[in-house]
Curated annotation (Swiss-Prot):
The gene is EARLI1. Residues 34-57 are annotated as: 3 X 8 AA repeats A of P-K-[HP]-K-P-V-P-S. It comes from Arabidopsis thaliana (Mouse-ear cress). Coiled coil: none annotated. The keyword Transit peptide does not apply. Probable lipid transfer protein (LTP). May improve freezing survival. Seems to control the flowering process and lignin synthesis. Has an auxiliary role for germinability and early seedling development under low temperature and salt stress conditions, probably in an abscisic acid- (ABA) dependent manner. Confers resistance to Botrytis cinerea and exhibits anti-fungal activity, at least against S.cerevisiae, B.cinerea and Fusarium oxysporum, probably by increasing their membrane permeability. InterPro entries: Bifun_inhib/LTP/seed_sf, Bifunc_inhib/LTP/seed_store, Hydrophob_seed_dom, Plant_LTP/defense-related. Keywords: Cell wall, Plant defense, Repeat, Secreted, Signal. This is Lipid transfer protein EARLI 1.
Length: 168
């Protein structure tokens, strides 16, 4: 009787562990729904005090004094890889299949669609920044010449490397 009871308890705990493991593993990665902000109550408007009429004064020209600290002129910013990628660079790991197939590292012809769909809504500069970030972080898992790899990936997705852009 005791062995039957302990077997039931063991089965109960095993099923609980399996249940909790499965529920924890099914995280959909969905963004949580936005929380509604409470509507603030209207604040009472202050009553404006009557303004006195200004008395006109004679205008006396004053000599112009040069500013002691002139504002330095900043040079125009050239596009570089200093921007931030608006998408998660780890998601660009799907571009590894595209890049490796183009370089004949892998047999078969994987679709470029998953990679290109990630950068589809981005302008060329943002797409270049994202792919540059992924290549520099070696998210793709391939050690390659970064500028050439960047150019190859952008060309596959019908994008162009912005002029003056350097992935350093």
């Amino acid at each position: 009787m005791a062995s039957k009871n302990s077997a039931s308890i063991a089965l109960f705990f095993a099923l609980n562990i399996i249940f909790f493991t499965l529920t924890a593993a099914t995280d959909c990665g969905c963004n949580p729904s936005p929380k509604h902000k409470p509507v603030p109550s209207p604040k009472p408007k202050p009553v404006p005090s009557p303004k006195p009429k200004p008395v006109p004064s004679p205008s006396v020209p004053s000599p112009s004094v040069p500013s002691p600290n002139p504002r330095p002129v900043t040079p125009p910013r050239t596009p570089g890889s200093s921007g931030n990628c608006p998408i998660d660079a780890l998601r660009l790991g799907v571009c590894a299949n595209v890049l490796s197939s183009l370089l004949n590292i892998q047999l078969g012809q994987p679709s470029a669609q998953p990679c290109c769909s990630l950068i589809q809504g981005l302008v060329d500069l943002d797409a270049a920044i994202c792919l540059c970030t992924a290549l520099r972080a070696n998210v793709l898992g391939i050690n390659l010449n970064v500028p050439i790899s960047l150019s190859v990936l952008l060309n596959v997705c019908n994008r162009k490397v912005p002029s003056g852009f350097q992935c350093a």
